Structures are given as C-alpha cells and as structure tokens.
Amino acid sequence: MFYCRSGFEKECAGEIQDKATQLEVFGFPRLKNNTGYVLFECYQEGDADRLIREIKFNELIFARQMFAVAAEVSDLPKDDRISPILDALSDVDGVPCCGDIRIETPDTNEAKELLKFCRKFTVPMRQALRGKKMLTERDSNRIPVLHICFIAPGHCYVGYSYTNNNSQFFMGIPRLKFPADAPSRSTLKLEEAFHVFIPKEEWDDRLASGMWGVDLGACPGGWTYQLVKRSMFVHAIDNGMMAQSLMDTGQVKHHMVDGFKFEPPRKNVTWLICDMVEKPARVAHLMGEWLIKGWAKEALFNLKLPMKGRYDEVLQDIENLKDFLKKNGFQYKLQAKHLYHDREEITVHIQAISNISPH
C-alpha cells in the first residue's frame, strides 16, 4: 500500500509499476481517483515484502509511505474492532514482531474525519498487540513498524514497513507549523524539503549559520525566510518586492534582475533555492548549469507540473538533468519528492558529492 496526495494516484501507480517491473516483481496497481492511496497486487506470495525491501523509498517521488499489506479487514463491529484485527494477523504467516504502531488514514477530507477515532484506538490496540507478542513492550525504531490504515469506519488494511526504508513521519507527512512572521505559506515547502532530504544529524553542517544562499524568484521571501532563520546570508533575485521584515535583518541582498541571468558576485554560495513559475525543463537545466559551473554546492528547487502527462514530464526532466550533469563530469546525489506542501509541482534536491568544479 502506498500513500500519495489525493489526485495523484495515477502518477503514484505508474511509478510503482515501473519500479516493480525493474525488480521483476509482477503484479498490477489498483486505484481509485482522489482516494490518496494505491494498492499494488503482487502475483507471487512474498513479493510484497520483497517490494518494500528492495524499492528504495527515498527514490520514490509520488509515494509518501509504503508498507506490505498482511490483511484487509472489513465490516468491523463497532463494539469490538480489536479482535478481528488480531485474528486476521494471527492467520497470516511472515508478519514480523514490530516496534511501533501507526494507526492512520489516507490524506483526504473524508478519511481525515477518522483521525480522531484513530488516535483513541491507538492505545487499546497497542496494548492488545503487546499482549499477543505482536508488538514489543517498548517502542523500538530498529525493527518494523505496524501500520493500520482505515479507509472507512469499519474497513482497514493492516501491514508493516521497515524503518530503514520508509517515511519516519505519521501518514508520511511532517507536521510543521506556519511561522507567524514568514512572508508567505510557501516557506513550509522549503522547511519540509529540509526535513525530507537532509538527515537531522547533518543540519548543523549543511544548514550552518554564516553560509550564503541564492533564492531565484524570491519574492515575497517565503523561501529566503528559511535561510535567514538559520542565520544565513541570501542573494534574493526577483523583480518584485521583498518583505520588509526580511530586508531589515541585514542578511538579504535584493537583486532586481531576471533569475535566468543572475550570476553570483563571489563563488561562495552553498545553497541555490528556486521556486519560479517557469517551464520545468527550463528550470532543471538552469539548476544544472549553476552546479556544473561550481556556483553552488547544493540546489533545492521546484518543478511545476503540466495538467496532463505529469509523471512522464517528471521522468523526462530529471533524466535530462542527470544526463547533463554526467556529461559534464559532475558527481551528485539527487532526490525528488512530491511533498505534502507541494501541489502541482515536485521538489528536487541535488547535492554535489565533490565540490571541485570541472569548469
């Protein structure tokens, strides 16, 4: 089972089908539009476990979470929902003892009405699972996570994910609060990207105070805000106006020029960030040019998606960018994700493995 943004089930299914085919795992996706999840039916027993081990979760763009389904339980009686779930799990071989439990729903307005129930249900369900030795007495992040996903009041899927190959977040969504002093809600996109792409233990080194960043298409400053908040200095590139609160910090230099024409005055930029409303292929190529010229060490940018053929567009743009970087002898690590705060766009992160530019 794969969670995704409501309305992006086809993209998620297409991606999973491609990954499964590459692994020679045969099956087919089952989906309904606007449900916020995709099920992939494997033809062979044991292949669901193989998929969640061998598909690299951090290489999936449209999936927020994945777990192997052990059982589907429907028509749960209101007076005892626990026993049928325990019985269903007891009937299945190969379900590992888990170290944590997440009782979730897909991210749709309809399903979210069940979240209050999920919270109340978690404690008694946890105790019952511990009583049956299906869950460890103490929470452990070293062994699998048990997922119970309710898609309707009496209907759930029960399964497990591996902690070294899943999303660490409940429902696959980081819980972030909008900062009252941020100039726009877009600030949450960049904050979420930091949580998803950069391990927390590396934040002090890679998001360090005193670094320089460049924000292409910066106005009014939602993304610049995240760098300023971390005591960085920023070249903000936009013909529009920046929020005065950011300019007053003394950490921002505003350049009223075209983002495609700006060149940093000194080659001391660590972070290149970009949320321009432009054709995705054009933005991706611009990011590649900055990196191979050695103008930035890490790039984080959004690619706006077309109305149709969204998955194909994403694949093409990322493949073209990878080819461009390789041809120029640039070594890199690339991740892309359709983040919770993204809508008709995906966020891409590239880190230079070697900061020595061939140019």
Swiss-Prot record:
Q: Where in the cell is it found?
A: Cytoplasm
The keyword Transport is assigned to this record: no
Gene Ontology molecular function, alphabetical: S-adenosylmethionine-dependent methyltransferase activity
In terms of superkingdom, the source organism counts as: Bacteria
Q: Which residues bind S-adenosyl-L-methionine?
A: S186, C219, P220, G221, G222, D238, D258, D275
Which reactions is this enzyme annotated as catalysing? cytidine(2498) in 23S rRNA + S-adenosyl-L-methionine = 2'-O-methylcytidine(2498) in 23S rRNA + S-adenosyl-L-homocysteine + H(+)
Q: Does the keyword rRNA processing apply?
A: yes
Q: What is its main location?
A: cytoplasm
Question: Matching InterPro entries, A to Z?
Answer: RlmM_FDX, RlmM_THUMP-like, RNA_MeTrfase_FtsJ_dom, rRNA_MeTrfase_M, SAM-dependent_MTases_sf
Active site (UniProt): K304
Q: What's the Enzyme Commission number for this chain?
A: 2.1.1.186
Q: What is the role of the protein in this entry?
A: Catalyzes the 2'-O-methylation at nucleotide C2498 in 23S rRNA.
HAMAP family the UniProt entry points to: 23SrRNA_methyltr_M
What assembly does the database describe for this protein?
Monomer.
Give the family per the record. Answer: Belongs to the class I-like SAM-binding methyltransferase superfamily. RNA methyltransferase RlmE family. RlmM subfamily.
What is the protein's given name? Ribosomal RNA large subunit methyltransferase M
